[in-house]
Design a protein with these regions (language model features):
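C-terminal peripheral helix-coil segments that are non-catalytic and often amphipathic
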Residues: 100, 104, 132-144, 148, ...
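Helix-turn-helix
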Residues: 13, 21-55, 59
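Amphipathic alpha-helical interface segments
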Residues: 17, 21, 38, 164-171
Length: 223
């Protein structure tokens, strides 16, 4: 008889399964029974470790937000450090880092894009709790460092990165990462009134070989 699964391992398996299913099918299109089957556990075990589907969804979104926040805060710190000497290069580096994150963790843009389609409408607080503070922190930093841009202009630039990157990462053209990266840089720099940086070093393309969209990856540490 197989030994019982340790509580942490079981919880991580449930979260990994739920993350993939919510990202691919949305909250409304996923059942607790599907999550239990995907995690290889029974429904009683799922309920014991994470509660109901609503509790599980909130935890999945919290983990996605924490991963995204860590990357955005790190990229903002680098932007603040470098923008004085090379504002265009700092902006390009920020967009590169966010694109890399979305390619490495495709479940994050997938989860948010599901919400854009009115999925999980009963969780209306998640945008204000998670997305809005990050958007405002990037917007306010742009206005502070690049004073030629109004708050409205800076916010639209942030949304440009968000919408285009999320859409690209869910598309069938993920073999075009270098082409899209260059396009995104040009687009955002033009929005912010900055020239393209000269001699921009080549970027490592962590996902260039992913020619077709894949099932969303699960958060690091819970697979």
């Amino acid at each position: 008889m197989p030994a019982p699964q340790p509580p942490i391992e079981s919880r991580d398996r449930i979260l990994a399964a739920a993350t993939a299913l919510f990202a691919e099918h949305g909250y409304d299109g996923t059942t607790t029974r599907q999550i239990a089957a995907a995690s290889g556990l029974n429904m009683a075990t799922v309920n014991y470790h994470v509660g109901g589907k609503a509790d599980l969804y909130r935890e999945v979104m919290r983990l996605a937000h924490e991963a995204e926040r860590a990357v955005v805060e790190g990229a903002l710190a680098a932007f603040l450090r470098d923008a004085g000497a090379d504002p265009a290069g700092a902006v390009a580096a920020f967009t590169d880092r966010y694109l890399d994150f979305c390619l490495e963790q495709p479940h994050v843009p997938a989860l948010w894009m599901r919400r854009w389609l009115a999925d999980a409408a009963e969780f209306a607080d998640l945008e204000d709790r998670y997305a809005r503070p990050l958007i405002e922190s990037v917007r306010d930093t742009i206005v502070e460092i690049l004073p030629g841009n109004s708050a409205d202009e800076a916010e639209l630039a942030v949304y440009t990165v968000l919408w285009t990157t999320h859409g690209f990462c869910r598309s069938a053209i993920r073999d075009q990462v270098p082409r899209f990266r260059a396009h995104l840089r040009r687009l955002v720099l033009k929005q912010l009134g900055l020239p393209e940086p000269s001699g921009q070093p080549g970027q490592t393309e962590p996902s260039e070989q992913r020619a077709q969209p894949q099932q969303p990856d699960v958060p690091a540490g819970i697979a």
